[in-house]
């Protein structure tokens, strides 16, 4: 039943002869609950959501009042967030849809109504994560890679296609269309929805969650959204809210404008560095100030995209005139654009730089005119390097101690060389710092016509000067939508990119997520034989160890323009601002400034070729634009027929033996330590997305099931099969488990025998003994992708608790939703400080009385009988998370609730 507050807030406005209902935030000010003009715009969007969806049960008056008090009383309370829609990509989407199919089967098995297992909000899945760069630097690359993509993923695609017929409210954008976040920005986002609610046309802000951490890109157009794990997204699809503490909002005041030579990429990398230093994990970031009006929407989207890299839940740009201009540019309906402005102005959510600034938790100032051309690397996005410092910083990193900014090698590394004999008879020499991969990739940048056309102009000038890319550099171009192909074609710039080997290889994430494909065999052999430190330069958003390519140890993020420039140079061991890139056809040195376009050149080109007609043409038939997809043969049966012999899609074990009622929370006793890790363990480390090695537990499983090595595909593509994924948990080739000294990769010591073995093998031995497991970790545990399998795999290995110094937001939440207890060392404590070496038996004194953020007693019993006692913080951040844990996970809770209805 709706409350008095909600009923009083219900208002109407008229536009073009149509009446619309909305829930007026000003009512809260009139009732003395909030000063709306002082609230950050992102908080206003959240406040409208709880006000409109208040039902006096899940969302109550207390939630409205708590959020209205933002900025007072330390932001106490939590927000139940029910987004208006959900987006998925195929790597994380397949397991989400598998879980829905499994939930439906479980519901059927106990005689429940399977129609209760249907998305209650619109769901769009965009297939973008599966294409790999097998073929490149030739005109047939796109077709060849797409053909291979369908061959490798036919069963997965058949399953996703089945889901479009089996589930209500679910659509799939076919392969070779674009990257989910770019398709979302250019087409899916309405900015303001109008839906029929109780017979009334009701207007409200577009909000979403997505099963990809870079869902945050949509905040660039003023749509509030962020990445969640697949399990949380599934709950959202089924009408369950996400709960999180009322966030702090850090305001970033932008002034002035970007100078000549700097790009949106440079700004995004600078923001990432600044905000990582500030510490914004779990916080909202909102951009404001006079500099905002000097940023085209595409630049804002680039900055918003990288929120996971700076650690924030989102990086929000409120809707303003520039947002409406972008909607018009991308072919959105004129009447709808008019409605967006009218509604947001009526409801105090339309940004105007002349208005009074909101009051933020804290404010950071950033002068755009101070942004310089930059890269980030070699192993983390927040490690900014000015272009002018790149040569010396690379050389320093080679011999710096092994870690986030060093490789721990000695000076002799600079003397190493690898001689390459290509199959065509030509030869080349690669040395330390040479570039093996140069990729224009990732929605972070390919959604931005300024940097994409900028790269095309760099290519044009380079070709005209007679410059060429060395043969050992693997070049590729993988845009996030077909619109990019259209404007590169119409501008005449694609031919110059082709001349340099940046041919179109596919529409998808490719190199940015590790789908870089193989290097030439002769290059791989030479690099491996010499153990040569080679590099990549990519226009992506992540460069964690082992992510881009197993043989490429140093990876640098850069703008598409710099990707082209570095590809031409063939090495990162160069001062591009002062040393020549190469010799022109006239024999003269060619420098970066000779091929770098002016801001005006880029702007003029954008104005000329980026048009609404282009967007309308490319998106007019978006769900049916791929013939190979349309021809997939699928059944319309509502229950999925799981094939027990499939190595791609299996019915997961999460619901096996599920009781009607949850059990009690009980102490965890005599756990053994399976992994002891340092800082910055990423979800890539925990659950890699890339290649499956033949000698790994996952590889052996596939070989045992008669899968040829060439058909292994990637971990990411096999997330619908829990048997593969549990074997791939903690299996990243670069993860360093301190319990397996002298090894790198997924190994541990099995304490009963002292034998070093694969983590999966040890976990299964412990499971046979009935022994639970624990993981010890440092700061920022679980940073990176919103990878639910990092938590699912942890659960299936038998890990009962993780004890870390701090967590990244999404992974902590995912652990709880999979029934794994996240504990946090108290300030100033760590495994090392407490003298824990990992050989201990760990017990946790947790019981039914536990509450969020309680301190619990942890006992560590050493081999010699010595006892170490300490207290750890229970990282349940809301009461509902306590329920998730009690049920053994969120999906188990959803199933029990649906059965009880």
UniProtKB/Swiss-Prot annotation:
Question: Which pathway does the protein contribute to?
Answer: Carbohydrate metabolism; tricarboxylic acid cycle; isocitrate from oxaloacetate: step 2/2; Organic acid metabolism; propanoate degradation
Q: Indicate whether RNA-binding appears among the record's keywords.
A: yes
Q: Which cofactors go with this protein?
A: [4Fe-4S] cluster
The alphabetized UniProt keywords are: Iron, Iron-sulfur, Lyase, Metal-binding, RNA-binding, Tricarboxylic acid cycle
The record, for InterPro entries, names: AcnA_IRP_Swivel, Acnase/IPM_dHydase_lsu_aba_1/3, Acoase/IPM_deHydtase_lsu_aba, Aconitase/3IPM_dehydase_swvl, Aconitase/IRP2, Aconitase_4Fe-4S_BS, Aconitase_4Fe-4S_dom, AconitaseA/IPMdHydase_ssu_swvl
**Which sites bind [4Fe-4S] cluster?**
443, 509, 512
Q: Which GO terms describe its biological process?
A: propionate metabolic process, methylcitrate cycle; tricarboxylic acid cycle
State the superkingdom: Bacteria
Q: Which Pfam families match?
A: Aconitase, Aconitase_C
| Family per record | Belongs to the aconitase/IPM isomerase family.
Q: What does this protein do?
A: Involved in the catabolism of short chain fatty acids (SCFA) via the tricarboxylic acid (TCA)(acetyl degradation route) and probably the 2-methylcitrate cycle I (propionate degradation route). Catalyzes the reversible isomerization of citrate to isocitrate via cis-aconitate. Could catalyze the hydration of 2-methyl-cis-aconitate to yield (2R,3S)-2-methylisocitrate. The apo form of AcnA functions as a RNA-binding regulatory protein.
PANTHER family tied to this protein: ACONITASE/IRON-RESPONSIVE ELEMENT FAMILY MEMBER (PTHR11670)
Name under which the protein is recorded:
Aconitate hydratase A
């Amino acid at each position: 039943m709706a409350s008095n507050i909600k009923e009083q807030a219900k208002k109407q406005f008229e536009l073009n002869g149509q009446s619309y209902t909305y829930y007026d935030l000003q009512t809260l000010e009139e009732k003395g609950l909030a000063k709306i003009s002082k609230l950050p715009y992102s908080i206003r969007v959240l406040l409208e959501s709880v006000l409109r969806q208040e039902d006096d049960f899940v969302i109550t008056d207390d939630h409205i009042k708590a959020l209205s008090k933002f900025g007072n009383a330390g932001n106490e309370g939590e927000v139940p967030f029910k987004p208006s829609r959900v987006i998925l990509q195929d790597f994380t989407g397949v397991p989400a849809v598998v879980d829905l199919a499994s939930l439906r089967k479980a519901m059927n098995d106990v005689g429940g109504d399977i129609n209760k297992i249907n998305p209650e909000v619109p769901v769009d899945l965009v297939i973008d994560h599966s294409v790999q760069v097998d073929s490149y630097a030739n005109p047939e690359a796109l077709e060849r890679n797409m053909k291979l993509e369908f061959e490798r993923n036919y069963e997965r695609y058949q399953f996703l296609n089945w889901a479009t017929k089996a589930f209500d409210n679910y659509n799939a954008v076919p392969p070779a269309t674009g990257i989910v976040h770019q398709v979302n920005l250019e087409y899916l986002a309405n900015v303001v929805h109008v839906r029929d609610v109780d017979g009334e046309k009701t207007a409200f802000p577009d909000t979403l969650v997505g099963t990809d951490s870079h869902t945050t890109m949509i905040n660039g157009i003023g749509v509030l959204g962020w990445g969640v794990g697949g399990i949380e997204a599934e709950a959202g699809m089924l009408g369950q809210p996400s709960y999180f503490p009322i966030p702090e909002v850090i305001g970033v005041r932008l002034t002035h404008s970007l100078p000549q030579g700097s790009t949106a990429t440079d700004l995004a990398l600078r923001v990432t560095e600044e905000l990582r230093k500030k510490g914004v994990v779990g916080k909202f970031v909102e951009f404001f100030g006079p500099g905002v009006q000097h940023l085209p929407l595409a630049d804002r989207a680039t900055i918003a995209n990288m929120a996971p890299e700076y650690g924030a839940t989102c990086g929000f740009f409120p809707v303003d005139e520039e947002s409406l201009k972008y909607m018009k540019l991308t072919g959105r309906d004129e009447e709808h654009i008019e409605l967006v402005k009218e509604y947001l102005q009526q409801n105090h959510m339309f940004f105007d730089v002349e208005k009074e600034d909101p009051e933020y938790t804290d404010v950071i100032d950033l002068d755009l005119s101070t942004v310089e051309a930059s890269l980030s690397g070699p192993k983390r996005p927040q490690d900014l390097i000015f272009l002018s410092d790149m040569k010396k910083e690379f050389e320093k990193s080679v011999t710096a101690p092994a870690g986030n900014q060093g490789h721990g090698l000695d000076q002799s590394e600079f003397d190493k060389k690898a001689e390459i004999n290509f199959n065509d008879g030509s030869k080349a020499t690669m040395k330390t710092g040479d570039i093996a991969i140069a990729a224009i990739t990732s929605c972070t940048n390919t959604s931005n016509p300024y940097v994409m056309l900028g790269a095309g102009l760099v290519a044009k000038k380079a070709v005209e000067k007679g410059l060429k890319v060395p043969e050992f550099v693997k070049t590729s171009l993988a845009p996030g939508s077909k619109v990019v192909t259209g404007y590169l074609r119409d501008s005449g710039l694609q031919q110059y990119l082709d001349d340099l080997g940046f041919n179109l290889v596919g529409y998808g994430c490719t190199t940015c997520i590790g789908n870089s494909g193989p290097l030439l065999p002769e290059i791989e052999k030479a690099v491996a034989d010499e153990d040569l430190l080679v590099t990549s330069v990519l226009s992506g958003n992540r460069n964690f160890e082992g992510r881009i390519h197993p043989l490429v140890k140093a990876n640098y993020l850069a703008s598409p323009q710099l990707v082209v420039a570095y590809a031409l140079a063939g090495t990162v061991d160069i001062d591009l601002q002062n040393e020549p890139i190469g010799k022109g056809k006239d024999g003269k040195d060619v420098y970066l400034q000779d091929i770098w376009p002016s801001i005006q050149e880029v702007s003029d080109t954008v104005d000329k070729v980026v048009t609404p007609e282009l967007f309308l043409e490319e998106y007019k038939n978006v769900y049916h634009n791929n013939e190979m997809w349309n021809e997939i043969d699928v059944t319309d049966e509502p229950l999925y027929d799981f094939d027990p012999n499939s190595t791609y899609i299996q019915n997961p074990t999460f619901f096996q033996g599920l009781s009607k009622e949850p059990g009690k929370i009980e102490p965890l006793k005599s756990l053994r330590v399976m992994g002891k890790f340092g800082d910055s363990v990423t979800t890539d480390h925990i659950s890699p997305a890339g290649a499956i090695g033949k000698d790994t537990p996952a590889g052996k499983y596939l070989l045992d099931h008669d899968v040829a090595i060439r058909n292994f595909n990637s971990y990411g593509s096999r997330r619908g099969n829990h048997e593969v994924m549990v074997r791939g948990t903690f299996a990243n080739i670069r993860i360093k488990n301190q319990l397996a000294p002298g090894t790198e990769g997924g190994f541990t010591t099995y304490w009963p025998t002292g034998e070093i073995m694969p983590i999966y093998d040890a976990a299964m031995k412990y499971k046979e003994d009935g022994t639970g497991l624990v993981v010890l970790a440092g700061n920022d545990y679980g940073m990176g992708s919103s990878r639910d399998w990092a938590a699912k795999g942890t659960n299936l290995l038998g890990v009962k608790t993780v004890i870390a110094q701090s967590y990244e937001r999404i992974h902590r939440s995912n652990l709880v939703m999979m029934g794994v207890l996240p504990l946090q060392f108290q300030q100033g404590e760590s495994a090392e400080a407490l003298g824990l070496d990992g050989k201990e038996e760990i017990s946790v004194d947790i019981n039914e009385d536990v509450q969020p953020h309680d301190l619990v007693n942890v006992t560590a019993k050493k081999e010699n009988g010595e006892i170490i006692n300490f207290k750890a913080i229970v990282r349940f951040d809301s009461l509902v998370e306590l329920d998730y844990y009690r049920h053994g996970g969120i999906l188990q809770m959803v199933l029990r609730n649906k059965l009880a209805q």
